[in-house]
Amino acid sequence: MDAGAETPDGWLLDVTESPDGRSVVRWVKERASGRVRRSAVEYRPPFLVTGPRERLADLARRLADDPRVAAVARRSGRPSLYDRRPRPVLAVVPARHAARRTLARAIDALGGFVDFSLYDVDLTAPQLYHFDHGLYPFAPVVDRGGTLVATEPAEAIDYAPPPLSVARFEVRIAGERRGRIPPPDGRIGAVTVGDVTLEGPEDDLLPAVVTEIARADPDILLSDGGDSFDLPWLYRRAAALGLGPDRFVLGREAVALRAARPASTFESYGRIL
């Protein structure tokens, strides 16, 4: 750590999208309290469109009354790394983050997939918030009037990591040995969260797990096979009991569990990988 660096107020753990579609949520681990503070700030970044000047002017007029668009501004800039001089650019701000890609595709179609080049479409609002504010995950930060400022550059290699709290997490099926394939209707008999092991019938056990995780508020749940078994089985049994994502909350934000990518099987020289 730079000896001259300012003492941080905390560490930026992450920036996520807000459910309202117009903001991002900043998660900061406070230095003084050790707790994680959630703060939402409005942030709707534009994506950029380049093309012939007259086509950009026509596009700006067409987008002015489009309900999917919050704002359109003409600028001069160098959106590409290969641009040696500024050129006309149209900055398009989607009304909601979820409309970003569909709006970009519609604009591309208006140009016959030839006239326009689009930039920053594939970057999410949290990614662009990091870039625009000089932030990065786990950055030590100070809060200056609601603006987070990193006290160390992203290129720093000698720095103190945030003091993350870790809790061991394990799910056990009643009457089954861990590691074996459970029966389709296997009931959860016990769940370990940190130093606490919870047991009992599922309709009491699963709400107790939510309560214990909220009480302990760990930054990391450390499990062996969590992605392949623990979490999917927990959510499966919660759904069987009628506990939706608004009631069965294992994180700091109520979100539904979904696979990051669909399951697939690959064959290579007769072996299933």
Q: What does each of the following model-derived ranges do?
A:
Residues M1-L273:
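The two-metal-ion catalytic cores of nucleic-acid processing enzymes
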